[in-house]
Amino acid sequence: MRLEYLQMIDRVVDLDLTGRKIVIESRVPSESTIFEGHFPGYPLMPGVLLTETMAQASGWLLLGLNRLSRMPFLAGVKEAKFRTFVQPGEVLSITAALEHEGSGYTVTKAFIQVDAKRVCDAMLTFRIVDFPNPDMTGYIRDTAARIGLPSLETAGG
């Protein structure tokens, strides 16, 4: 996880195309300039970055389901709940599942756990569009390889 670059995903643990679900793992860095202000003497992962982490996990699920052919963009967040704090150095297990799609939008349900304890969850809405340019397509394909997105020909389904 590289907070300053909003790169929230470390690795794909499982991509189940048939079950329309993904599991991701990410470690919150032990140190980051973000923690200098959130909060001095008691560093906590900001809720907005936890939401971004769930959105990115959902995005990788949708990219997988679309075989990296179209780009999901976050369009809405509903029912976000934060149940406890996330501290530097903790390992996050992020799960996202497709809830429904239609009318040009897709909805996922995502949650984050630390040590098998749920820390937050949300319903996330995405608009899926063609890639805006070849640079974005290349970046997504390179990132997919870096985080270990399974070959889409062999991924669980």
Q: Where do the language-model regions lie?
A:
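Conserved positions in beta-strands of structured domains
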Residues: 10-13, 78, 83, 97-99, ...
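Short aromatic-glycine motifs in intrinsically disordered, low-complexity regions
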Residues: 1-3, 67
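Hydrophobic core residues within well-ordered beta-strands of beta-rich domains
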Residues: 6-8, 92, 106
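Compact, glycine-rich, soluble single-domain proteins
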Residues: 38-46, 50-60, 74
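Catalytic strand-loop segment that frames the active site of acyl-thioester-processing enzymes
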Residues: 4-45
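HotDog/MaoC-like acyl-thioester-processing domains
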Residues: 21, 88, 97-157
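Short, hydrophobic/aromatic-enriched beta-strand segments in well-ordered soluble domains
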Residues: 26, 95-98
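Hydrophobic beta-strand-centered segment that forms part of the acyl-chain substrate-binding groove
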Residues: 57-93, 119-123, 127-129
